[in-house]
Amino acid sequence: MLLIDVGNSHVVFGIQGENGGRVCVRELFRLAPDARKTQDEYSLLIHALCERAGVGRASLRDAFISSVVPVLTKTIADAVAQISGVQPVVFGPWAYEHLPVRIPEPVRAEIGTDLVANAVAAYVHFRSACVVVDCGTALTFTAVDGTGLIQGVAIAPGLRTAVQSLHTGTAQLPLVPLALPDSVLGKDTTHAVQAGVVRGTLFVIRAMIAQCQKELGCRCAAVITGGLSRLFSSEVDFPPIDAQLTLSGLAHIARLVPTSLLPPATVSGSSGN
């Protein structure tokens, strides 16, 4: 099955397989989201990249999409259908009743489907209360209690969003490459911005996880995901990083929900990564 995560920073394509009865996923490639591209342009690009990744047409017969970019949802779904001849299923609130996590009414109407997929993957893995941190366009924290109830979400500016905002919102600060400096004491402008944004985000993550644990009432597990989570891979005493968490969640959801109940290519999703 082809898995597609349409986010604000990347459109991530992966493929689902099984290893000893366990769901496993493999990321194939990433695209920059571009609302100006047509269905035909996306179809040609996706087909070429799938072939380069060794994925044949037969593997595209089933596709499952999460999207938090509504303007792109139908375009990409139709592009995949153009290649495979089968319309993908778009994950949305129609499926929430069939998940191992529960979403309370105030959250249900607004939570991004990518965050739901993250929560599913983490809860299936830990089988207990957990906090999921997603480092994307936004920095998000999703807290799940021991019963599988999503207690809430916190959203902050993501790393790239922060450095771009400093560049566009000031007269002299340059657009700084993202890197984790050794010290918070910047010796030049680039180092100073990296110290404040990247090191600062690291401290925010640690503090927010601790506060989520306090409000959940337990010292629960945590996991980090998202395209920029790699920046923290060298950190010790830090939660594990799982760059494939969203795709894993989609793979679990695709197996759990009766997708035949939904007319495919229904636009869904909310603000997310």
Curated annotation (Swiss-Prot):
This is Type III pantothenate kinase. Catalyzes the phosphorylation of pantothenate (Pan), the first step in CoA biosynthesis. Keywords: ATP-binding, Coenzyme A biosynthesis, Cytoplasm, Kinase, Metal-binding, Nucleotide-binding, Potassium, Transferase. A monovalent cation. Ammonium or potassium. Homodimer. The gene is coaX. Its main location: cytoplasm. Belongs to the type III pantothenate kinase family. One of its GO terms (biological process) is coenzyme A biosynthetic process. Its cofactor is NH4(+); K(+). GO terms for cellular component: cytoplasm. It catalyses: (R)-pantothenate + ATP = (R)-4'-phosphopantothenate + ADP + H(+). It comes from the Bacteria. InterPro entries: ATPase_NBD (IPR043129), Type_III_PanK (IPR004619). Its EC number is 2.7.1.33. SUPFAM superfamilies: Actin-like ATPase domain. Pathway: Cofactor biosynthesis; coenzyme A biosynthesis; CoA from (R)-pantothenate: step 1/5. NCBIfam families: baf. Coiled coil: none annotated.
